[in-house]
Amino acid sequence: MKALKASIRVAVTALALSLSFAAPSHAEEDEAGALTRQMKQLYRAGKYTEALPLAQKSLALREKEFGPDDANVAMPLNDLGTIQYNLGQYAVAEPLYKRALAIREKTLGADHAEVAMVLNNLGDLYRAEERYAEAEPLLKRSIAIGEKTNDPSMVLALSNLGAVYSNQGRYDQAVPLFKRGLAVLEKALGPDDPEATVLMNNLADAYINRHRYADAERLLKRSIAVTEKAFGPDHPDVAQAQNNLAALYARQGRNAEAERLFKRSAAAMEKTLGPNHPDLAGVLENLAGLYRDQGRYADAQQTLKRSMAIRAKTRPI
């Protein structure tokens, strides 16, 4: 069973930074600001499809006002890239991140915290595409900038580098990164802040693969409870943690519990992310594996066929 590696990507949480570089006309500034606020709310609620046109319009306004390579355009590029990433549109997200990175390096210098932000996001995109050799140096560079500038947001890259290692079975390297990141977030935000649940999921997955099942179950249940309280039962992060908990139950032979959670996870992902998202394909693959292990071959074949159809639509070209 595959657990879905959670990841942290900076998007609308830092949008206000882009407003300080210049003084655009009041009409367009007001419109862009309103779009930004709406997009932030939708993004945090996991409503990425609804956030997408707002991000696209915000970017268009910035480009019209400042030109395509101005510093004010970098944040809208980054945010649109992150929303496309969350929609599974990796090939669309990559050039947006690369443009944002080039602008920030040119205007802010190579060691600025906002450069580290985009390095993290691009590195995590490569992780999602299993381009680990490209992801690792970007995430390490992001961490190095954070350490140099004493920026606590380096926890983002710590988590995602840990996910790169975990995806490759390098759990002894992943666990310390997850623990370090989780400690930083809990100290800064408190033990029940939903921002910390991403690291809970990643650390739990590493524990599963090291056969520390009780520790993993505790973290995943906590992650589900915190995220449901903050965002409701259909949020993508809830679905992701449910998938991971189901994978744990499947390993333990708790098949009925695993099937129930896989189905809940798939239903929530389809509702919030759409029927063709890569994360949904991952849950369906896990459910198909559970069916196969129980000798339910017709169910397994039907479920796997659906997953393969999603993969064919979303696989990078």
Task: Enumerate the predicted regions with their spans.
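Intrinsic-disorder-linked linear interaction elements in eukaryotic regulatory proteins
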Residues: 1-317
